[in-house]
């Protein structure tokens, strides 16, 4: 069929043609957002899950919803190599300059001064261009947790003064170091205590709840950590059929069953298989034969890109561990079983 009309979009954080199976979480987020703007903030949301399940797509949807409600939004991908403080300051500068338009606001001017103080303590000794004076004694202690709390409190007050709010959408949150994570949690805790319209949504890998709990013991009371995983059979079928039906293309039932079985409802695989099967098919309906024709291309694409990129980053010990898991078959697996496969003690099995 016409490759130009192919509705499927495999990629990193690429919005799928049909965002299916996440309605409950999106609704929960929108309620939390509206409550925060109304001065009744509650728990912030941190979706967690493996790569390819759609966490970044959800963050982008949350971004869209916040904009629709006329909130200010900063979208950050946490850097692996540090520099989060500068990145946060740069994004908040843009927000405050937006809020500074129109009638003079004491709260906004104060927030700009506190941001100036915050940037004066950047690790490399540089600052971000702001045509205001720093406010002494605010966000200038050099203690990241206190300074970040001062800054987000001031920005929250500035947003409230403009009848707005702030959404911080933070992707790859597990890359924050312990000090950065503790500082951010501390800052959100303070804005909640002061009923300020500040909401944090942070997506990360499954280890994020443990990292957050280690950083601040009250993290589990401040955030919800919904698990984002594979889709059920009905939702997986909808991911395939909704965008194709919009183009007048159908699947045979056995083809749908085959694709749902092959992908196990894993969102990225649904997009990858859907993309290649569409290109392999000559006309509607898409059949089992089309899937068989597309299979080598899908396997090559996954092997050379999806899997290889991750495998290349593994240490030799991690590769051995991964190979042992693969030899055990579909998981999950207990650490004791993996240790037995590696012929080592449980306490020394983990890479």
What annotation goes with each model-predicted range?
Residues 46, 52, 79-83, 175, ...:
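Conserved nucleotide-binding/hydrolysis micro-motifs of P-loop NTPases
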Residues 1-43, 107:
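A short, basic N-terminal segment
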Residues 265, 271-346:
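Winged-helix-like regulatory helical subdomains adjacent to P-loop NTPase cores
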Residues 179, 342-351:
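Short amphipathic alpha-helical interaction segments
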Residues 89-93, 112, 116-119, 156, ...:
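Short, amphipathic alpha-helical segments that act as regulatory/interfacial helices
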Residues 38-53, 57-168, 196-198:
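P-loop NTPase nucleotide-binding core
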Residues 36, 208-264, 276, 283-285:
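Helix-loop-helix "sensor" segment of P-loop NTPases
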Residues 160-170, 174-183, 187-217:
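Sensor-1/coupling segment of RecA-like P-loop NTPase cores
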